[in-house]
Amino acid sequence: MKCPFCGYEETKVLDSRPVSNGTSIRRRRECLQCQARFTTYERYEQTRIRIIKKDGRRELYDRKKLMNGILKACEKRPVSTDQIEEIVDNIEEQLRRSGNSEIYSSEIGDKVMEQLKSIDQVAYVRFASVYKEFRDLDSFLQAIRELKNS
């Protein structure tokens, strides 16, 4: 694996452990040239799932897009990147197990909200505000009431 700091081609693995219900492996590596340390994740390649958007368009599932949406909701919140990775890994595992080659974007949004609810309520409301397309203060207040009552 190429070092992201100096570009040297050889690294050694310092630590390797399964993560996310055993669906991926986290490896801690060290560059043999500059001794910089970095983390990599290895996961098996999944079948291509298509997302059905609200307007009916279809596009290929993009892990980065899902990660970025969750990262934005969790910005400046006490939610680690590892927790966000775990959310995405859990959702991907559910998608794989469903056996469906297509899924509605609303189902993925519901899965994200379900997981964020137990991790960080502010991130949950932030994500919901974009996903549910809140247009006014009443929409926010309704989401907060529902969160408090659950």
Curated annotation (Swiss-Prot):
Residues 49-139 form the ATP-cone domain. Keywords: ATP-binding, DNA-binding, Metal-binding, Nucleotide-binding, Repressor, Transcription, Transcription regulation, Zinc, Zinc-finger. Binds 1 zinc ion. Pfam families: ATP-cone, Zn_ribbon_NrdR. GO terms for biological process: negative regulation of DNA-templated transcription. Its cofactor is Zn(2+). Negatively regulates transcription of bacterial ribonucleotide reductase nrd genes and operons by binding to NrdR-boxes. Belongs to the NrdR family. PANTHER family: TRANSCRIPTIONAL REPRESSOR NRDR. This is Transcriptional repressor NrdR. It comes from Petrotoga mobilis (strain DSM 10674 / SJ95).
